Amino acid sequence: MSTENKQSLPAITLAAIGVVYGDIGTSPLYTLRECLSGQFGFGVERDAVFGFLSLIFWLLIFVVSIKYLTFVMRADNAGEGGILTLMSLAGRNTSARTTSMLVIMGLIGGSFFYGEVVITPAISVMSAIEGLEIVAPQLDTWIVPLSIIVLTLLFMIQKHGTAMVGKLFAPIMLTWFLILAGLGLRSIIANPEVLHALNPMWAVHFFLEYKTVSFIALGAVVLSITGVEALYADMGHFGKFPIRLAWFTVVLPSLTLNYFGQGALLLKNPEAIKNPFFLLAPDWALIPLLIIAALATVIASQAVISGVFSLTRQAVRLGYLSPMRIIHTSEMESGQIYIPFVNWMLYVAVVIVIVSFEHSSNLAAAYGIAVTGTMVLTSILSTTVARQNWHWNKYFVALILIAFLCVDIPLFTANLDKLLSGGWLPLSLGTVMFIVMTTWKSERFRLLRRMHEHGNSLEAMIASLEKSPPVRVPGTAVYMSRAINVIPFALMHNLKHNKVLHERVILLTLRTEDAPYVHNVRRVQIEQLSPTFWRVVASYGWRETPNVEEVFHRCGLEGLSCRMMETSFFMSHESLILGKRPWYLRLRGKLYLLLQRNALRAPDQFEIPPNRVIELGTQVEI
C-alpha cells in the first residue's frame, strides 16, 4: 500500500513540507547575500539584482520542478528513491562493463552526499544564529558557541528518536514558509518593479553584461537549490504526489516571494546586503524571526541527519559499508533509525567545520561542489533508466540528457572555483567515503572468493554425511552461510576438529534483495536437502534489518519448528592476513583489515543471543 493511501493527502503533504523541504527552504537565509556580498565584484545594482533573481527563479523551475519532480522521480524502486536506488535501477538491463561504470557513478554520488552532509547543519544553523548581529551586534562573538550548543543538543536527542518532536516539524516548517512568503510579499508591494526579474531575458542579459564573472557567480546561485536531492531520496517516505503538491502549492511560491522580496529591499536600500533576509522584517519581529529561523534550520539539519542514517543503512545492506549497529527508534516506522557511530562521527566533523570556518559566508564557499556533482550523476543515471528500463526513444533521451547537462555542467564547473577556498572539504570527505565503500566491496568479494575456492560440493558432502554419519548429538545446529550452494566454513571446521554433528542441521542464508522491502510471503524459502539437513534462505529488502528470531517464526509457520534458546549457532570468524600485493593494493588491504576489525559481529548484527553462538576461527590470506 502506498504512503498516500495510508494517510490523508493533506496530512502527508504537510509532513513532506516538514521533512523534505527543510534544506532548500532555509536557503533564503544566505543565498542572495552571498550572490551580492562583493566577492564576485558586483555592486548592489539593478542589473545584478535582476540577473541573480532571474537565475534563482529559473533554476528552481528547471532543476527542481522539471528535472527532479517531473522526470527523476519517475524512476523508483518499489516507491523508493535516492542515488543508490537510481544506480541499482540503471544497472538492471545493461552489460557488465556498463553496470560497473554506473555503480561507480552511484557510489561517487553517495560519497558526495557524505561530503555535503557535514556542511548543511553547520551553514544552516550558523545562518540563523547570525541574525543576532542585527538584534544585538555585541553578541557577534557568541555565534559560534551558540551554533555548537544548538547542534550538540540536536545530535544528543538522536538516540531517543524524533517521533515525538517530529510531529512539530510540519507545523513549524509550514509557519516558516508562510513567514517567507509574507515578508517577501510585504517588500514586493513596496517595490513591485522587482517582478520584472521573472523574465528569463534578465538572466541572459546578466551573462552578456558581466561575462566571465557571471559564470563564476553561478557558484553562489546554486545555493538556492541545495537539498534538491532530498526530494528524490525521501520519495519512499511520502510518495510522489504529496511531494510535488507541497512544492507547487507552498514551497515554490514562498521561496519566490522571499527571494524577490529581498531583491526589492536591496533596490531601495543597498546597505541591507549585510543580511537582507533578517532586514526584511520590521524591528519588532526580529527576535521571533530569529527563533523560528533557528527552529527551521534545526529541522533542516535533522532531515539531513536522518538522510545520512538511511543512506548508510542502504549501503550496509547492499554490501558497500561494513556492518554497524543500527537502532530502531520507532516500533511503528521502520525508517526511523539511529546509527551511533555515524551520529557522533558526523557531530565531530560538524563542530570542527563550525570552529574552522567561523562564519556562514566562509562555509558557503565550501558548499555546492558536492551538490552539483551529484546533479550531473543523477542526470546520467536517470536518462540511462529512461532508455534501458522505460525503453524511451534514444534520440529523445539524448535531448533530455543534453538539456540537463547544459545546466548541470556549468553549475558544477563554476563551483570548482571554490576548490581552494573551501570546496576541498566536501571533495575530500567524499573521496574518503568512496575509497571506504569500494575497498569494503572489492575486498569482501576477494575474501569470499578465497574462502569458497576449495570447490567441495554441498550436495556430495551431505550425501556422504548421511551415508557415513559422524557422532550425532541431540538438538538443532544452524550454520550461517553467505552463499547458498557452498559448504559453510564453520561446518567444515566443526567436523574437522570436533567430529560431531547435531541431529538436525539448518544451513541459513540471509539474502538482500534489490528492493526496499520483501513481502512476508516471500520472506523464507525452506528446502529439505536430506533427512537431517535443511536449507533456509531468508530474503530482506535493503530498507529492512535481518532478524533471526523472525526467520525462526516464519520457519515455524512453514512447518520447520525452531526454538532460539534450544539452537546452537555455528559461525566462522576469519583471521585475515595480507598476501603479496603491489603497494597500493596493500594499502587497500590494510584499510579493509581496519574496517573488518571494527565491523559489527554477526551475532549482534542478526540479534542472536551470545550464549547460543559458537565461533570457529580460521586464518585466511587475502
From Swiss-Prot:
The keyword Membrane applies. One of its GO terms (molecular function) is potassium ion transmembrane transporter activity. Its main location: membrane. GO terms for cellular component: plasma membrane. It comes from the Bacteria. The keyword Membrane applies. It catalyses: K(+)(in) + H(+)(in) = K(+)(out) + H(+)(out). It is found in: Cell inner membrane. The chain crosses the membrane at residues 9-29, 49-69, 103-123, 137-157, 165-185, 213-233, 247-267, 276-296, 337-357, 363-383, 396-416, 419-439. Keywords: Cell inner membrane, Cell membrane, Ion transport, Membrane, Potassium, Potassium transport, Symport, Transmembrane, Transmembrane helix, Transport. Pfam families: K_trans (PF02705), K_trans_C (PF22776). It is a multi-pass membrane protein. Responsible for the low-affinity transport of potassium into the cell. Likely operates as a K(+):H(+) symporter. NCBIfam families: kup (TIGR00794), PRK10745.1 (NF008015). Belongs to the HAK/KUP transporter (TC 2.A.72) family. This is Low affinity potassium transport system protein Kup. It comes from Escherichia fergusonii (strain ATCC 35469 / DSM 13698 / CCUG 18766 / IAM 14443 / JCM 21226 / LMG 7866 / NBRC 102419 / NCTC 12128 / CDC 0568-73).
